[in-house]
Amino acid sequence: VFGCAKKENSTSSSNEETTISDDSSSGSMILSGKLAQGYVRGAKVLADVDGDGIRDSNESQGTSDTSGSYVLNADPGSWMLITSGGTFLDSKGNEVNALPMKAPAPTTSGATSNVTPLTSLVAANPSLKAKLDALGGDGWNADIASSSGVPGKLLRIAQTVEQTMMTLSTGSNAVLTTDSSKLKTLDKLADAFAMQENISSNEALAAATQEGVLNALNDENVVTLSADQKKIKGALVDATLVAVDSVTAAISDTSENVVETSVASTLEAALDNATSVVGTALNL
């Protein structure tokens, strides 16, 4: 599980394990921000130095509060923020398991470092930073769950990533079942988005999703598919495109702000539809 302690061998003391798994942080930089799909509460936030996604004793870790906020101290470096666990509330007030996300290390102390689907793309492919910044608002570091909203261009990209990932990782027919497979799929999506020009357009969102998902499903280092899942790769891609269509229908390609909660119920219904496509294909 990402952000949690590495398993110690049987000779390790329980005190050593507790020390590594408990939240603690130190360093000359103060960083804080929001974990946003909805606002993600109770998630571990790890300043991952060695890139393995598993907390070591020298790595700072915190937990997001009920408003999705976190605070950490860490030393400057090339580490990455990685989240694991946590939940957010859907439009009906039900808790939904959050996706793992990541974000680049900030370069200055005190800077706001949000962790969202957008920052996850940039952490995986830094060339996307300029493309997302060009879309307005706070660009790649936008708080996508803000009650003030964010430019529709940014929100539709964030929601395309989120709905695609949720389609493949929700319910009893989930294809992506580990944080590792989810984060590696995010990497594939980021590389596919980086190849698009007008990345918030309907065409770019569909093309990037199709390519990124196919590349993930075809890479055994990302996910090992069952025999039945291998037979329905096309249907799995189609299901994610159903989710993307719902995003582009609900969120205009606009520079005007759109509030995430205003489209949440529509996207939740569409996600149910997309995951049912996966279930139907597997049961044929």
Where are these regions (language model features)?
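Feature for extracytoplasmic/surface-facing segments of secreted or surface-associated proteins
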Residues: C4-L284
